[in-house]
């Protein structure tokens, strides 16, 4: 053994070849600080051993290295710039040391080789993989960019255009694509990976392969003429500006970094990369996007705990009520390997449900995600039925009938009598209290809410609603089933609107008040989309939700929270509802809708709507963008904080993920609690108090006032644990 540490070891093989194997005690290898320090010492030991003629990098895991340890990021990013620079220089010295070893080096890859793992193997002379190999640099998805030499070595290895595509998109290349662009030198069978690696390395040692020429290419300036460089970088900037936009600076910064470093040798180019990395690491966007990643891991961890604690796994499911929503739920269950009975009283609804499932599977087939055989198998695992025969086989039943409490209660009561005492019943409802529906059941402990979002196949969030009688085992089993479906389940306690709809309607109320005071709805939409970053402004979102649906839900919320959410009079939603302008579903709401050539709705503004809205709108008035943002967002933010204060949702992490996954809250802002931390809670309290005269929705929750006085934040613990 040449060197041994907790996460890696170096041993001598035959013919002067040494093998450096990453072998962390955890389930995956990560390039955390400890592993980097061990790698540094291992490389020193290798350089000092005159018997070593070649080095093979390998992994004892199914994945080579999944990347840096992201849990360390927020702590590192919070350090002074000089300390952050030292960390990057330390990592750069290690990879330079690997690249400068006086003998050829080769990485044998399998599974994921991502982020810092990819940057590590870019420092070796050769890379071969098997069919499972996936290699790439996903850092821009976290609001940062490669910082261990990725923007320097990748363009010099595969060319600037291919490198910029991979880096700006945060892309991982599968084996075939990696081979095509030059990231991999060969793909071999998994059982021959190490033998092939040794053969290739031996050829390099014997100088049958020119490893020194390859190394020189990676450590020299890019070979681009001035004209080629101008065309390449101008085109890349144009494409990135179009796709990433101003709220996500990391992709554009990556292009600028590669451009600035193009004519420089390795070490000077690394200085450029380091400078830009630090700038991004200190950005609020990076804090938010890294925070989302960590929060997502937290949600997944909770789901795993639930699966472990659950009394049984879900092997079979049933959906009551077909149509688009029922078909979407059935599709998602079957796609992830849980056969499902789809029951409805109407043949045309069953047909619609099966058509929806088939349509979604066809899209998977077209994209090459599944083959025809698998598609047939998935469709066969959805059993459409007009009867309850076979319902007793279901471990979990999802009721998804019409949003009517009497109908839902009757269906749930009926099906409860047909299944055994262990079967879990759930209701897919967006507005009906779970405690109300539970009254119709003999076993309310086996019942909870399971609120899917439309379209089911795209929206990651499922709200799991705990009623006052719901058992912990019921929650665990349903959370585990939702996770098995590939969803992000978040548990909330029962209240009107649960969590997502409860916090959405104060946002709509803020929007309605602005219109009452003379704001133009198109201007509000423009500001909330382009400046705040929502995928849709409030008027457009109401059209998509459905004005009729929103009108009904608004009444439910007003009844549930009369102090804050009762209407003071007719509003824009009422005016459109009375005019039967229901939004996208019937072609007219705030906007007019037509269908484009691809069958997708296309919106346009029409003056006709102004006459309908005139009685509920004040005299036209201009508001500056910041006022529009503050007046729409403060009611939502206050309601989110109240939900945490009241225990409707358990943590800031879960609330922020529900907002991002359920409502499309701008990811670069990280959710309401991350947003509050970013702008400063004391600053928010002062800002919100300016609008106190607008009513109860604008009153700052006591929790925020206390935190402002104490100078605390919601994510201080997450940052401290990373230090």
Swiss-Prot record:
The record marks 119, 139 as: Important for catalytic activity. Keywords: Fatty acid metabolism, Isomerase, Lipid degradation, Lipid metabolism, Lyase, Multifunctional enzyme, NAD, Oxidoreductase. The active site is at residue 451. Residues 1-189 are annotated as: Enoyl-CoA hydratase/isomerase. Residues 311-723 are annotated as: 3-hydroxyacyl-CoA dehydrogenase. GO terms for biological process: fatty acid beta-oxidation. It catalyses: a (3S)-3-hydroxyacyl-CoA + NAD(+) = a 3-oxoacyl-CoA + NADH + H(+); a (3S)-3-hydroxyacyl-CoA = a (2E)-enoyl-CoA + H2O; a 4-saturated-(3S)-3-hydroxyacyl-CoA = a (3E)-enoyl-CoA + H2O; (3S)-3-hydroxybutanoyl-CoA = (3R)-3-hydroxybutanoyl-CoA. GO terms for molecular function: 3-hydroxybutyryl-CoA epimerase activity; delta(3)-delta(2)-enoyl-CoA isomerase activity; enoyl-CoA hydratase activity; long-chain-3-hydroxyacyl-CoA dehydrogenase activity; NAD+ binding. Substrate binds at residues 296, 501, 661. Gene3D superfamilies: 1.10.1040.50, 2-enoyl-CoA Hydratase, Chain A, domain 1 (3.90.226.10), NAD(P)-binding Rossmann-like Domain (3.40.50.720). One of its GO terms (cellular component) is fatty acid beta-oxidation multienzyme complex. The keyword Membrane does not apply. Pathway: Lipid metabolism; fatty acid beta-oxidation. It holds the Pfam family 3HCDH_N. NAD(+) binds at residues 325, 344, 401-403, 408, 430, 454. Its EC number is 4.2.1.17, 5.1.2.3, 5.3.3.8, 1.1.1.35. Involved in the aerobic and anaerobic degradation of long-chain fatty acids via beta-oxidation cycle. Catalyzes the formation of 3-oxoacyl-CoA from enoyl-CoA via L-3-hydroxyacyl-CoA. It can also use D-3-hydroxyacyl-CoA and cis-3-enoyl-CoA as substrate. Heterotetramer of two alpha chains (FadB) and two beta chains (FadA). In the N-terminal section; belongs to the enoyl-CoA hydratase/isomerase family. In the C-terminal section; belongs to the 3-hydroxyacyl-CoA dehydrogenase family. This is Fatty acid oxidation complex subunit alpha. It comes from Vibrio cholerae serotype O1 (strain ATCC 39541 / Classical Ogawa 395 / O395).
């Amino acid at each position: 053994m040449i060197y041994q540490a907790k996460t890696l070891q170096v041993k001598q093989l035959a013919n002067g070849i040494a093998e450096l194997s990453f072998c962390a005690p955890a389930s995956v290898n990560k390039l955390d600080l400890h592993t980097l320090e061990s790698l540094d010492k291992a490389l020193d030991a290798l350089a000092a051993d005159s018997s070593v003629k070649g080095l093979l990098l390998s992994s004892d895991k199914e994945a080579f290295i999944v990347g840096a340890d992201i849990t360390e990021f927020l702590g590192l990013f919070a350090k002074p710039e000089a300390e952050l620079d030292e960390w990057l220089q330390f990592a750069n010295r290690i990879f330079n040391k690997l690249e400068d070893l006086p003998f050829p080096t080769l990485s044998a890859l399998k599974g994921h080789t991502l982020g810092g793992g990819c940057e590590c193997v870019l420092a070796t002379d050769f890379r071969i993989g098997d069919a499972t190999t996936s290699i790439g640099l996903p850092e821009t998805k976290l609001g940062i960019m490669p910082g261990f030499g990725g923007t320097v070595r990748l363009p010099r290895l595969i060319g600037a255009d291919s490198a910029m595509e991979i880096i700006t998109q945060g892309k991982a290349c599968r084996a075939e694509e990696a081979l095509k662009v030059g990231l991999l030198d060969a793909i071999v069978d998994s059982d021959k990976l190490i033998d092939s690696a040794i053969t290739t390395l031996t050829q390099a040692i014997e100088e049958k392969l020119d490893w020194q020429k390859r190394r020189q290419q990676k450590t020299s300036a890019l070979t681009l003429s001035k004209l080629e460089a101008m065309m390449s970088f101008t085109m890349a900037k144009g494409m990135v500006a179009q796709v990433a936009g101003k709220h996500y600076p990391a992709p554009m910064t990556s292009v600028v970094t590669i451009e600035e470093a193009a004519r420089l040798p390795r070490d000077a180019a690394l200085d450029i990369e380091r400078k830009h990395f630090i700038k991004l690491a200190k950005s609020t966007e990076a804090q938010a996007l890294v925070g989302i990643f960590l929060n997502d891991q937290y949600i997944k961890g909770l789901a795993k705990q639930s699966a472990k604690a659950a009394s049984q796994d879900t092997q079979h499911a049933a959906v009551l009520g077909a149509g688009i929503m029922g078909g979407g739920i059935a599709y998602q269950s079957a796609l992830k390997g849980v056969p499902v009975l789809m029951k409805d009283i109407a043949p045309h609804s069953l047909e619609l449900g099966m058509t929806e499932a088939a349509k979604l599977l066809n899209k998977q087939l077209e994209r090459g995600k599944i083959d025809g055989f698998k598609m047939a198998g998935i469709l066969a695992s959805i059993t459409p039925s007009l009867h309850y025969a076979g319902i007793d086989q279901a471990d979990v039943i999802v009721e998804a009938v019409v949003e009517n409490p009497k109908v839902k209660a009757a269906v749930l009561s009926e099906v409860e009598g047909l299944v055994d005492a262990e079967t879990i019943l759930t209701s897919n409802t967006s507005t009906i209290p779970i405690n109300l529906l539970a009254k119709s059941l003999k076993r309310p402990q086996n019942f909870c809410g399971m609120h899917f979002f439309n379209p089911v196949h795209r929206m990651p969030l499922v709200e799991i609603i705990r009623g006052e009688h719901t058992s912990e085992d019921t929650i665990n089993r349903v959370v585990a089933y939702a996770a098995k479906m590939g969803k992000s389940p978040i548990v909330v306690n029962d209240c009107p609107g649960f969590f997502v709809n409860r916090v959405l309607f104060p946002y709509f109320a803020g929007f309605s008040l602005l219109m009452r005071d003379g704001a133009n709805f198109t201007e509000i939409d423009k500001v909330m989309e382009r400046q705040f970053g929502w995928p849709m402004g409030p008027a457009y979102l109401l059209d998509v939700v459905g004005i009729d649906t929103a009108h009904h839900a608004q009444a439910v919320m007003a009844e549930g929270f009369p102090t804050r959410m009762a209407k003071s009079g007719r509003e824009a939603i009422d005016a459109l509802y009375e005019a039967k302008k229901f939004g996208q579903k019937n072609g007219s709401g705030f906007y007019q809708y037509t269908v484009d050539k691809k069958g997708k709705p296309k919106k346009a503004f029409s003056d006709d709507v102004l006459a309908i809205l005139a009685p509920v709108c004040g005299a036209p008035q201009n508001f500056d963008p910041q006022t529009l943002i503050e007046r729409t967002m403060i009611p939502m933010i206050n309601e989110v904080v109240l939900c945490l204060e009241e225990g409707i949702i358990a943590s800031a992490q879960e609330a922020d993920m529900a907002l991002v996954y359920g409502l499309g809250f701008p990811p670069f802002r990280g959710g309401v609690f991350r947003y509050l931390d970013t702008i400063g809670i004391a600053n928010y309290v002062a800002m919100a108090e300016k609008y106190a005269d607008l009513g109860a929705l604008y009153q700052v929750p006591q929790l925020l006032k206390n935190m402002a006085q104490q100078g605390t934040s919601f994510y201080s613990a997450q940052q401290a644990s990373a230090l």
